[in-house]
Amino acid sequence: MNNYIKIWDVILNELSKIYSDEVFKETFSNIKKIKQIEEKIIISVETEFIKNKIYKMYFEKIKEINKLKFEEKIIIEFVSENNKKNCNFDNEKKHFENIKKELKNETEIFFCKIENNDEFKNNKHFRKNEIKQIENGYNDNINVEIENRKISFNKYNYGNTNPKYSFDNFVVGKSNNFAFKISKKIAEEKKVTTNPLYIFGKSGIGKTHLIQAIGNHILKNTHSSKKVLYVKADGFIEEFTNQLRKAKMEDFNEKYRDIDLLLVDDIQIMAGATRTQMEFFKLFDYLYLNQKQIVITSDKQASELKNIMSRLTSRFEAGLMVDIQSPDFNHRLNILKKKILEFEPQNTLKIKKDVLDLIASSFVNNVREMEGALLRLLNYAQTFGYDIDINIANEALELLIKSKKSVSYDEDVLEKIKLVVSNFFNISVRDLMSKKRQQKYTFPRHIAIYLIKELKDIPYNIVGSFFKRNHSAVFKAYQKIKKNSQSDYELKKSLELILKKINS
């Protein structure tokens, strides 16, 4: 017996040289007892989770050390304390009733051996399909090992993605096409080939939609039995902190490690949360080593994350990083049209183009804000019984648009555009910005408006505020130059020369 204890001590000593103190203590400090049965060492650990972890992550190394250090053939086996205990039906029923009180959705319960199968079958506590499963798989009056039994609860809230997010209702454009295609590819693949997927971009441009669409697609179309978990980073921090305080880390680990797809939104929120980052690092490595898919979103690329451990950011960078840019004007129009169809599926709601142009040009960098503005307008018109036109749109969205005007733009670039255009047409900046209606002033003014829109994608109403013109006048000026530049060679040449000077 002592010899076998010494053998295990030698193996432990070698493992401590290979793995960090943190990993070693977490996994191998939970050894309960060691016993010998002939040429076999049986090592008891506290939980089934720890046993499985050792087999998945460390057992090959243990066998390798065993072979190198000892000549005689020694078999090492791990068992968990809670799996060794046989429990009778009454105990199991009490356990089941306790779980029922605690949980509201679906969960998994691990049953011990049931000694009397007839008692099991005759008890109304179990459903018919469970009885049928026993009858089909086993004879009466034998021990039955039942694992991973599904009952009508879900302890860990797997499959918690919002069903409204799908690939079908995601509006694809140049700014998000690559991120969309990669996300769909990952959702459709049976094997993990891209891990992790790291999607970054400004707030409100579709990152959350995409990662939840991945989860929903997997749940609905491909692998419905897979466990999918969506969590925002702040929710992960709160949950980890609470479970740590309550000494329930085993539940926490069981929840997050027994999944097939982890979706983490806004990872940048973990900045400065050192303990949480350490826990997430361990979780990340566990899922990665076990070929479980990880998808992460952030408002910036991994190399720009502040106060996030470098060993985490390096793992993010080792995967596939894809960005989503702000949508261009036409893309924003398409998003608005899609949103209108969601609001009125019968397509009876007609909104004029100038109204959509106003919204699309006023909310440039945040799709969520733009959609919110549209919904405000639709509800405003519906509540008061108005037909939607440009006047009603301005009335309904006045405060929202005014707040957007406070956004700062690169004044140096705007000033340079005005100066270059004025010099090119040999007029003063003052005349360019004036309300003079002569052709020698209006044409250069229209050119300046067009270039500001093209180069900076600033909303029409804000461009109008620069020139003291309304939205409609600015829109017409832009469209006129854009249309004429396609057929007027001289105009096209002038625009190219002006652009060259601006960029020099």
From Swiss-Prot:
- Any one cellular component term from GO for this entry? plasma membrane
Q: What is one process in the GO biological process aspect for this record? A: regulation of DNA replication
Q: Which domain of life is it from?
A: Bacteria
**InterPro entries named among the record's database cross-references:** AAA+_ATPase (IPR003593), Chromosome_initiator_DnaA (IPR001957), Chromosome_initiator_DnaA-like (IPR020591), DnaA_C (IPR013159), DnaA_dom (IPR013317), DnaA_N_dom (IPR024633), DnaA_N_sf (IPR038454), P-loop_NTPase (IPR027417)
Location of the region described as Domain IV, binds dsDNA in the Swiss-Prot/TrEMBL record: 382-504
Q: Where in the cell is it found?
A: Cytoplasm
Molecular function via GO: ATP binding; ATP hydrolysis activity; DNA replication origin binding; lipid binding
Is NADP among the key words of this record? Answer: no
Region Domain I, interacts with DnaA modulators, residue ranges: 1-80
Domain II: region residues? 80-159
- Which residue intervals make up region (Domain III, AAA+ region)? 160-381
Q: Give the keywords, sorted.
A: ATP-binding, Cytoplasm, DNA replication, DNA-binding, Lipid-binding, Nucleotide-binding
A Pfam family of this chain: Bac_DnaA_C
Residues that coordinate or bind ATP = G204, G206, K207, T208
Q: Does the keyword Nucleotide-binding apply?
A: yes
Could you tell me which Gene3D superfamilies the record lists for this protein?
A: 1.10.1750.10, 1.10.8.60, 3.30.300.180, P-loop containing nucleotide triphosphate hydrolases (3.40.50.300)
The Swiss-Prot or TrEMBL note on domains reads:
Domain I is involved in oligomerization and binding regulators, domain II is flexibile and of varying length in different bacteria, domain III forms the AAA+ region, while domain IV binds dsDNA.
On subunit structure and binding partners, the annotation says:
Oligomerizes as a right-handed, spiral filament on DNA at oriC.
Return the PANTHER family for the record.
CHROMOSOMAL REPLICATION INITIATOR PROTEIN DNAA
| Record's function text | Plays an essential role in the initiation and regulation of chromosomal replication. ATP-DnaA binds to the origin of replication (oriC) to initiate formation of the DNA replication initiation complex once per cell cycle. Binds the DnaA box (a 9 base pair repeat at the origin) and separates the double-stranded (ds)DNA. Forms a right-handed helical filament on oriC DNA; dsDNA binds to the exterior of the filament while single-stranded (ss)DNA is stabiized in the filament's interior.
Report the sequence similarity comment from the record: Belongs to the DnaA family.
What name does UniProt use for this protein?
Chromosomal replication initiator protein DnaA
Provenance organism: Aster yellows witches'-broom phytoplasma (strain AYWB)
Q: Identify the coding gene.
A: dnaA
